[in-house]
């Protein structure tokens, strides 16, 4: 019945149970649907209180800028990656996305290239290094690193060698 019923009004993403006319089983298997649960309200309140305690919005912006700089400096210095957004004026300082490039990467088939970010993500997740940083499903194959004010620059700096390690492992 879910597959045959189309409401006349738009549904919030949280309540959409089908995609492309078929039931979306991924949402029942733990896939992220990018809609916050109402159960997360207390987490938002705690985060807002924490943000206020460190200096409010100006401090959070400063932290996000510092975090993005750590990752962006690495991207700009690393020949096998590039920022997914070419125009620096259009880049975000929170969800920094980058794609792979270079001689080895370019020698791969299109399908193999598309698999590289996901393989790196899975390798690092298996090591307990990071979670939920694979690129968006509908974006070009990429990695997406959270650089918002809620993380420490040192943690982003610690992640970078792991990405380098995983990329090197894939080339073996």
Model-derived features: where do they sit?
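Active-site C-terminal subdomain of aminotransferase-like
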Residues: 1-74, 87
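Conserved C-terminal alpha-helix-loop-beta "cap" of PLP-dependent enzymes
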Residues: 76, 80-154, 158
